UniProtKB/Swiss-Prot annotation:
Keywords: Amino-acid transport, Glycoprotein, Ion transport, Membrane, Sodium, Sodium transport, Symport, Transmembrane, Transmembrane helix, Transport. InterPro entries: Na/ntran_symport, SNS_sf. Residues 26-39 have a biased composition (Basic and acidic residues). This is Sodium-dependent nutrient amino acid transporter 1. GO terms for cellular component: plasma membrane. GO terms for molecular function: amino acid:sodium symporter activity; D-amino acid transmembrane transporter activity; L-amino acid transmembrane transporter activity; neutral L-amino acid transmembrane transporter activity. Belongs to the sodium:neurotransmitter symporter (SNF) (TC 2.A.22) family. It comes from Drosophila virilis. The chain crosses the membrane at residues 48-68, 75-95, 128-148, 225-245, 254-274, 303-323, 337-357, 397-417, 443-463, 470-490, 515-535, 549-569.
Length: 637
């Protein structure tokens, strides 16, 4: 029997007034679907899992999580982080996997579920581009440090003649030089305190003066790109292109190495780190909770930001990866594996890094480990190299391993983000060759990344990360969840999951998606915006023009949502604006599984549910709120 009309997505008209859908497949649509080329699938499910691990278990775990934790309560930060993981991270991650696999579409095309929300996809693409550009600059730094790690002596371990108040980072010499300089400084009565505080390690001065040639301010411009970092940036983009040039056929094979190799290095570093003197103190410092921080709303905000950053939620790569799955792939298992492994890796990375920093503090005779830690980029390229240079045995080997690990982690993250952009373009323009789009976007990524390898590049990185990445992703993730769960409807969405997985959706997911996840995200976002303060880099506030540029960047990303919604309503007019607006909130005729046969089965499945619920509604005669509770518990079938 051919289904001529689509019931209102199995929703009772009296109780699902917000969730109606009038999908009416016709012969023209079916013919169009048959003519479209089939989407490439992963060679096997393990490639998908490894790809998700490579993007979710990345720089966010080894580079960002440790200093975020110690800045927000140490071990106490793990409590809000784990709570946020279960109430926001896991639900959002699973939701994005589902929507990608169900539709076999990228970040923009999935919004046939609610066409006026297509701006969410474009806004996420904008944020993804911002993140890609500065991520690639971090890769350039890792390539540079990896290359110089093979010198007979690590170049950041000793001072240059023109570096004033510098202390060598060599093992024993560091402490000796520090004590000598401090003693000399203290002998100068009026200048003692000033000179002591000016002492800097050779690793810090090497990074600031030799590698990035940092400017103290950017009021007079950011300067020209450094030629060495430009070459390193170019090498990074060549590797990225080679990995993604054939789509999932090439990136899927590379995912095994990108996902597993970092663990080999991480465990090797952990094995070495825990044997160092002072390592236990560093680990205790990392895990020791500061309970008072649990009542600080900023800590909870940082937990959400870290969760999004680490899992790559809200940027599109999870949706993109899942869109290449078979329709019946078991993604629930994969979602649980990746989100759990991500948390464990963050803990592993934190313990490893703080064991090394504990040894650094021990060598420097410093009681407070906080005094030897720098946040942001400085953690990876100042604190870690400083600690590694003090290793007694072959520091070059551990340095090369560490920076190669960072490079692999960065490649895994950027490959996913870049593939998201390429997929969006190829989904929109079906005739485009994937490798040509990959090459064009890689060239654009390289050119945009040049701004970050200038003397003022770290200033720009801080600005773009704060305004173009963090907050844009945050607000669009709220709209993403609202569009799927509140507009399309929780029950409709759960019906689709049941059809795809042949299993009912548990109460945990229903409650999180409909209540806990969106409410927590909205409250934290509002608090963040109300309490936001001007950003600064290296204890220096940005000039007014910098803050203005940042807000413009945020506005451009966030404005994608209303602008594309307005465009859709204007180009799909009905009798009145109100009718056009309401129609834009309903799924289009393109919504649903992309495979024609699967789509036909889905329509029949939804039709049967609608008939059953109509009978139940007449016999039960439930009140509105009772029916809502009944649906929430998943007993409406």
């Amino acid at each position: 029997m051919e289904l001529k009309t689509m019931p209102q997505n199995g929703a009772n008209a009296g109780t699902q007034h917000n969730n109606n859908s009038n999908n009416k497949p016709d012969n023209n649509e079916k013919e169009a679907q048959k003519k479209e080329p089939e989407r490439t699938n992963w060679s096997n499910g393990l490639e998908f899992l490894m790809s998700c691990i490579s993007v979710s278990v990345g720089l966010g775990n080894v580079w960002r999580f440790p200093f975020t934790a110690y800045e927000n309560g140490g071990g106490a930060f793990l409590i809000p982080y784990i709570i946020v993981l279960f109430l926001i991270g896991k639900p959002m991650y699973y939701l994005e996997m589902i929507i990608g696999q169900f539709t076999s579409q990228g970040t923009v095309k999935i919004w046939s579920i609610c066409p006026s929300f297509m701006g969410v996809g474009y806004g996420q693409a904008f944020a993804t581009i911002c993140i890609i550009t500065y991520y690639s600059s971090l890769l350039a730094l890792t390539v540079y440090y990896l290359f110089v790690s093979f010198q007979s002596e690590l170049p950041w371990s000793y001072c240059r003649d023109d570096w004033v108040n510098c202390v060598n980072s060599r093992p024993a010499e560091y402490v000796e030089t520090l004590l000598t300089n401090a003693s000399s400084a203290l002998s100068r009565a009026t200048e003692s305190a000033t000179n002591v505080t000016k002492l800097q390690s050779s690793s810090e001065l090497y990074f600031l003066n030799v590698v990035i040639k940092e400017k103290s301010d950017i009021t007079d411009g950011i300067g020209a790109p450094d030629w060495k970092l430009t070459i390193a940036l170019f090498v990074s983009w060549v590797v990225i292109f080679l990995v993604i040039m054939r789509g999932v056929k090439s990136s899927g094979k590379a995912a095994y190495f990108l996902a597993l190799f970092p663990y080999v290095v991480l465990f090797a570093l952990l094995g070495r780190a825990v044997t160092l003197e002072g390592a236990v103190d560093g680990i205790i410092f990392f895990l020791q909770p500061q309970w008072g921080e649990l009542l600080n709303p900023i800590v909870w905000k940082e937990a959400v930001v870290q969760c999004f950053f680490s899992l790559a939620v809200g940027c599109g790569p999870i949706i993109m990866f899942a869109s290449y799955n078979r329709f019946d792939h078991g993604i629930y298992r994969d979602a649980m594996i990746v989100t759990t492994l991500d948390t464990l890796t963050s803990l592993l990375g934190g313990i490893t890094i703080f064991a090394i920093l504990g040894n650094l503090a021990h060598n420097l005779k410093v009681d407070n480990i906080r005094d030897v830690v720098r946040s942001g980029t400085g953690l990876a390229f100042i604190s870690y190299p400083d600690a590694i240079s003090k290793f007694q045995a072959v520091p070059q080997l551990f340095s090369a391993l560490f920076f190669f690990m960072l490079f692999v982690l960065g490649i895994g993250s950027i490959v996913a983000l870049q593939s998201t952009i390429v997929t969006i373009i190829c989904d929109q323009f079906k005739t485009c060759k994937y490798w040509k789009v990959a090459m064009a976007t890689s060239i654009c990524g390289f050119l945009m990344g040049l701004v970050y390898v200038t003397p003022g590049g770290q200033w720009i990185l801080t600005l773009v990360d704060f305004y173009g990445g963090t907050y844009v992703v945050f607000i669009l993730a709220i709209f993403e969840l609202a569009g799927i769960v509140w507009i399309y409807g929780l029950q409709n969405f759960c019906d689709d999951i049941e059809f795809m997985s042949n299993k009912k959706v548990s109460l945990y997911w229903r409650i999180c998606w409909s209540f806990f996840t969106p409410i927590m995200m909205i409250v934290i976002f509002i608090y963040s915006m109300v309490t936001i303060s001007p950003i600064k880099y290296s204890d220096t506030y940005f000039p007014v023009a910098g803050d203005v540029a940042g807000w413009v960047l945020f506005a451009v990303g966030a404005a994608q949502f209303p602008l594309w919604g307005w465009w859709y309503i204007r180009t799909h007019r009905h009798d009145s604006f109100s009718k056009s607006f309401m129609a834009s909130l309903k799924p289009s005729e393109k919504w649903g599984p992309s495979n024609p046969e699967t789509r036909r089965d889905w329509l029949l499945f939804k039709s049967d549910l609608a008939a059953k619920r109509a009978i139940q509604a007449k016999s039960n005669k439930m009140g509105f709120f009772r029916q809502k509770l009944y649906n929430l518990c998943g007993n409406s079938n």
